[in-house]
Amino acid sequence: MPVWVDADACPKVIKEVLFRAAERTETPVILVANQPLRVPPSKFIRARQVPAGFDVADNEIVRCCEPGDLVVTADIPLAAEVIAKGAVALNPRGERYSEATIRERLTMRDFMDTLRASGIQTGGPDALSQRDRQQFAAELDKWLSGRKRQA
């Protein structure tokens, strides 16, 4: 069960956490992006470049992931698709999405899109904090531990 990373928007510090975990646990990590990526030399870490275009990287992740795989993404619609396929979705802030929470997130995302379309400034997310990084690492470790027990 590999880790799939929506790499175009994934913070560098989160990629570094993933790289260390890949080496430590011998878990495949596949970064998917529509631009060239630099990854450390490793038999466990791969970069997959897809053509530029709307949702091309997302569609590649949905096509390739399987039940039980981990997908790291902040993209709510992508998270919803991989959850529907049986994969686990984790955002870079360490929030693990579930079928229940992803519906709520999709509704909020659609509402915010409507506000932005009407000209209301909604602002962006806060900068990634140390607490966010720790939460991400903890959730990643939980998934990796569960993967080990299943093997």
Curated annotation (Swiss-Prot):
User: Which CDD domains does the entry link to?
Assistant: PIN_YqxD-like
The record's disulfide annotation reads: none
Pfam name, any one: DUF188
Family to which this protein belongs? Belongs to the UPF0178 family.
Which HAMAP family does its entry note? UPF0178
Name it.
Answer: UPF0178 protein ESA_02916
Q: Species name for this entry?
A: Cronobacter sakazakii (strain ATCC BAA-894) (Enterobacter sakazakii)
Q: What is the lineage of its organism?
A: Bacteria, Pseudomonadati, Pseudomonadota, Gammaproteobacteria, Enterobacterales
